[in-house]
C-alpha cells in the first residue's frame, strides 16, 4: 500500500491528539475495526501499514483488530457486535479507535455505546461520509480519500 497515505493518516491522528507523539515511552492501545472479514486480501496490508506508521513515528502501540463482517450480518446484528467490540476495548483501556470503510464508521457511531464519544476516533476509506454526523463529534477525524485497493490487487 502507499506509505504516503499511511503517513498522512498518522499526521491526522497527531493533529487530533496533541502530545500523543511526544510520549513514546507509553504503550498505547488501539482498536482497529475493519468492516469485512479477515479473509479479505487487503486487510493484512492495512494492519501492517498501521503498525508500520506508528512504529516509524516512534510510538509503541498494541493494536487489536476486530472484524465486523458486514457482508454477513444484518445492521441490527452489526450494532450488537460493535457494542461488544467497545466493551472489550473499554476493558483493555483503549486509547484510540481506528476504523476502515463505511460500515465500521457508521456502525460505531450509531451502535449506542458511548466509547466512540469518549475516545479519539479516526476513520478512513469512507465512500459516503455523513457530514452532519462527523461535524457533531469533535473527537472524530476522518480521511475521506479512497485508498486505491484495486490498483494493488
Which residues does each PLM region occupy?
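Short hydrophobic alpha-helices and adjacent helix-cap/hinge residues
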Residues: 2-5, 20-153
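Bacterial N-terminal signal peptides
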Residues: 8-18
Amino acid at each position: 500500500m502507499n506509505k504516503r497515505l499511511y503517513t498522512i493518516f498518522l499526521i491526522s491522528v497527531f493533529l487530533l491528539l496533541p502530545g500523543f507523539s511526544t510520549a513514546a515511552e507509553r504503550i498505547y492501545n488501539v482498536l482497529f475495526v475493519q468492516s469485512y472479514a479477515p479473509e479479505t486480501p487487503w486487510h493484512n496490508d492495512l494492519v501492517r501499514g498501521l503498525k508500520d506508521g506508528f512504529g516509524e513515528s516512534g510510538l509503541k502501540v498494541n493494536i487489536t483488530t476486530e472484524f465486523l463482517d458486514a457482508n454477513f450480518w444484518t445492521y441490527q446484528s452489526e450494532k450488537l457486535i460493535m457494542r461488544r467490540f467497545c466493551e472489550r476495548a473499554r476493558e483493555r483501556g483503549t486509547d484510540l479507535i481506528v476504523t476502515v470503510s463505511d460500515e465500521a464508521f457508521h456502525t460505531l457511531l450509531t451502535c449506542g455505546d458511548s466509547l466512540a464519544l469518549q475516545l479519539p476516533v479516526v476513520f478512513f476509506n469512507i465512500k459516503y461520509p455523513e457530514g452532519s454526523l462527523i461535524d457533531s463529534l469533535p473527537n472524530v477525524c476522518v480521511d475521506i480519500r479512497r485508498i486505491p485497493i484495486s490498483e494493488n490487487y
